[in-house]
Amino acid sequence: MKYDLEFLENYWMPFTSNRDFKADPRLVVRGEGVYMYSQEGERILDGSSGLFCCAAGHSRPEIAEAVYAQLKEAAYVPPFQLSQPLAFELARRVSQLTPDGLDHIFFVNSGSEAVDTAMKVAYAYHYARGEGQRQRFVSRERAYHGVNMAGVSLSGMIKNRQVFGPGIPGVVHMRHTWLPENRFVKGQPETGIELADDLERIAMNYGPDTIAACVV
């Protein structure tokens, strides 16, 4: 099936060259297990589980039935000063899978939102301890940490940052550990050992008591 430009016009796709995509659109119409299927019937291996959020696969009847059962009860219960029992049950189950000490669960909708939330937790944690001056975050060049403003600021991918202004203040990037001269080296490389101390270098430069977290 061919779609004209008018049909494709209104959806502004994220992380995509919209003009190029709409000139030659590739649309998925269904999924089953680890595969997705295009409108032409082409089978595509979903090797990244969607955006890492379909780990159980596509078109699982038991998941669809559970979602439908919940939608018949309530489509959404806001979590601000209110909740519903299944949220607590899910948090309890997740906490049984995590290491000791990591037993409080905060639900978010995406990895990008998780990074934003983690930064807020770090800010609030240090503020509560009387160390509100800890407002600097250390990340790494070429890192990717999401599409929200906090994630873009932490990310070290130039093309993902250059059109979005200065970003969140107080973000410092460690140098990337990949060096061209080490690409074919076997064993311990002879160059780049100083990069292992980059976090310490940054801490000493700005002051260890100004750093809120290191994001890796």
Which positions does each model-derived feature cover?
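Generic secondary-structure signature for well-ordered alpha-helical cores
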Residues: 13, 68-76, 95-99, 127, ...
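Electropositive phosphate-/nucleotide-binding environments in soluble metabolic enzymes
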Residues: 26-30, 57, 61, 84, ...
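Conserved beta-strand and immediately adjacent loop positions that scaffold enzyme active sites
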Residues: 33-35, 104, 136
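Short coil/turn connectors at secondary-structure junctions
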Residues: 40, 100-103, 132-135, 149, ...
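PLP-dependent aminotransferase-class I/II
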Residues: 142-216
